[in-house]
Amino acid sequence: MQKAMTINGTEFNVVSLLGKGKGGYSYLAERDGKKFVLKQIHHEPCSYYTFGNKIEAEQNDYATLKSTGIRLPKLIDTDVKQERILKEFIDGPTAMDLVKQDKMTDAYIGQVKEMCRLLYPAGLNIDYFPTIFVVQNDVLFYIDYECNNYMEEWNLENWGIKYWSKTKEFLDYVNGSSAQ
């Protein structure tokens, strides 16, 4: 892991790897005592998802989601040449962590359902997997920018909610089976 990365010539100290997704690696980065998420796009194959231009998709999906009013981290900067984006860091446990620790509440489920009430009329689904939702000060944020055209089979009620409690699907995932 690199100790420093730049976005459009501005250097950020890389603290740790936060996670790897379908489209890139997300790092906790710092500059002047402030925390950020720095995402480096990757081009590793993904058997269940087809990508076009990932940087363009990040920018377009952010604008689309922002227009719906769901809570998500601010897109601060994009470095097209290096295929990196800089996002606001939302500090807190993931919904996955909360389920594992038996701390998932009806209030958090209600907040993701409220996001659906904003997304579905716009013809959108997001990735409802609980690793990409973070709770900060009892407020749930969707920390990814991925969104897709609405399909009933991939909505919260038919797919995502299976991973928001200790269901068979959740336990299979935690014990090594793949959910995505």
Model-based region annotation:
Residues 108-110, 120-126, 135-180:
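C-lobe/activation-segment region of protein kinase-like
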Residues 62, 116-120:
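Hydrophobic core positions within the conserved protein kinase catalytic domain
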Residues 73-78, 124-136:
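A short glycine-rich, hydrophobically flanked beta-strand micro-motif that places a catalytic Asp/Glu
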Residues 36, 71, 85, 141-144:
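Protein kinase-like catalytic core scaffold
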Residues 1-16:
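Juxta-kinase regulatory segment immediately upstream of eukaryotic protein kinase catalytic domains
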Residues 60-71:
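Structural motif at the C-terminus of the N-lobe alphaC helix and the adjacent alphaC-beta4 loop
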Residues 14-56:
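ATP-binding glycine-rich loop module of kinase domains
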Residues 51, 70-109:
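Conserved structural core of kinase catalytic domains
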